[in-house]
């Protein structure tokens, strides 16, 4: 698929993701952690892509191995930016990162973020548990 077609498809997906989050009640004024996903079977190429993403101002996670359903293994990392859930900002980042991925011959696998809402909106079953100093639940009998 050409870069232009990838960009167009990504822009449509971005609008769908943002609208779904807002329709579900995610806070439109919150700062979101936007995680752009990259993968490759070639570590050297992936590392070059990570360096380039860092130079563009993104926080970059360490590369991790991921086993696919067919048993093959790929390497992946995320390029992270924190900002408003703004389609123009996300489109700009996607364009930069899709071009970067094409240059380094790695895969750009889209982006994701987390629902941002009032804490009261969540029913967390663990709210009543106490935790020890290491963060593990204390068992009650």
Curated annotation (Swiss-Prot):
Belongs to the RraB family. It comes from Shewanella amazonensis (strain ATCC BAA-1098 / SB2B). GO terms for molecular function: endoribonuclease inhibitor activity; enzyme binding. It is found in: Cytoplasm. InterPro entries: RraB, RraB-like_sf, RraB_dom. Keywords: Cytoplasm. The lineage of its organism: Bacteria, Pseudomonadati, Pseudomonadota, Gammaproteobacteria, Alteromonadales. The keyword Cytoplasm applies. Interacts with the C-terminal region of Rne. Globally modulates RNA abundance by binding to RNase E (Rne) and regulating its endonucleolytic activity. Can modulate Rne action in a substrate-dependent manner by altering the composition of the degradosome. Disulfide bonds: none annotated. This is Regulator of ribonuclease activity B.
